[in-house]
Amino acid sequence: MSDYYCWGQEVYSPCDGIVVGAEDGYAENEKTNLLADMSNAYKNAHYFDPEKDDIQSVAGNYVIIKYSENVYAALCHLQTGSIQVSVGQMIKKGEVIGRVGHSGNSFAPHLHFQLMDSSDISVANGVPCAFEQYEIFRDNEWQIIENGIPTDKDRIRFW
């Protein structure tokens, strides 16, 4: 996993809030296996049943933060044993919550981040996410964007 630049990097809380979900201890995937991971992704996308299936098989180790009424942040696929927060804990934006991992239904080490309208990740709907600042590659140069929402076609970066 150490060949992946993000694996083991610290993950920071994107907002002030209260931790309403934190699950650790789900086994880290030992290697990447594209065919097996694609098969799992297909199975989870089409046949996942929240009544009988474990959400950790999809999300791996995760933290859910309540930001405001009906807005929750989920940070998933965290490294096993790295979560540093617990349910009920008030946290501040920028506080370390864990490390990037390769747990759950993950093609390779990465951080899955989403805003959603419920603390239950298995039934929540997505909420648009605005970033305070990022850069977009446009007209052959990087341009700073403040308080924007990138589109699915934008090439962006953070620093």
Question: Model-derived features: where do they sit?
Answer:
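Acidic, glycine-rich catalytic/binding loops that coordinate metals and/or anionic ligands
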Residues: 46-49, 53-55, 89, 114-159
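Short glycine/proline-centered loop/turn elements that form peptide/ligand docking sites
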Residues: 84-87, 102-109
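A structural signal for short beta-strand/turn segments enriched in small hydrophobics and glycine
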Residues: 17, 88-100
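Short, small/polar residue-rich loop motifs at catalytic or cofactor-binding pockets
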Residues: 5-7, 58-59, 83-84
